[in-house]
Structure formats: C-alpha cells, structure tokens
Amino acid sequence: MPHGKAPQLFYILDKLINEYGASTLVYESIDFGVHKSQADSYGRFVGVIELIAFNHQLDIECYGPKHIKRIAAGIGDASKGQVIESINTKYGLSVTDDNEADAIAIYHTYMEALCRMK
C-alpha cells in the first residue's frame, strides 16, 4: 500500500465500522517470500488495521493464505481460479473477481474458527 493509501483505508474502514458495526477485523497474512516493497505496504496495512481495531475496541484475527485456501477450496495451494470456483459452488454465488472471492473465503475461515470455539 503506497503511503497515500493508508489514510484512505483508515477512512473507509472507520466509516464501514461506524455504519455497520463489527466486533472483529479479519485479514490475510502474507507469505514470507515477498518482495521488500510488498512487505513495506503490508506493514502499513497492518498498522492501519491495528489502529482501527484499537480505536473501535475490536478483536483482530489473521489467517495465512494456505489456511484460507484449505478452508475455501479444500487444498492449501489452490489457485485463484480454484478458490473462485469453490466459493461459487459452496455458496451459490457468481463471483468472478479473485479479491471478492478472497474476502468471502477469509470471512468463512473466521466463521469456521468461531464455530469451533463454541
């Protein structure tokens, strides 16, 4: 995330939380083999997440890509296409964008973990 995007992300998340409410922020971690510029952007992203969570007194949960893919598609090294196909099949959707599929997969990963805790 470029430096200028962090305030925009903060504003969007703050507005969504104020409008719809939340108890937990859930996001996907990155793999360790990423390029330095990606790691820098990710660090800014996590900083925004932590600040928003602190301001709104929210819990934070983070899941690795392989875990999310395993929950979504049944295998930890699923391709983007496999995740999209699995999300559409499991939930009767017609998602075509991999970012949307990832968001749905992250949500369901969290919900599965939450159900296991109860």
Q: Would you name each region that the model predicts?
A:
Residues 1-118:
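Phosphate- and other anionic-substrate recognition elements at nucleic-acid/protein interfaces
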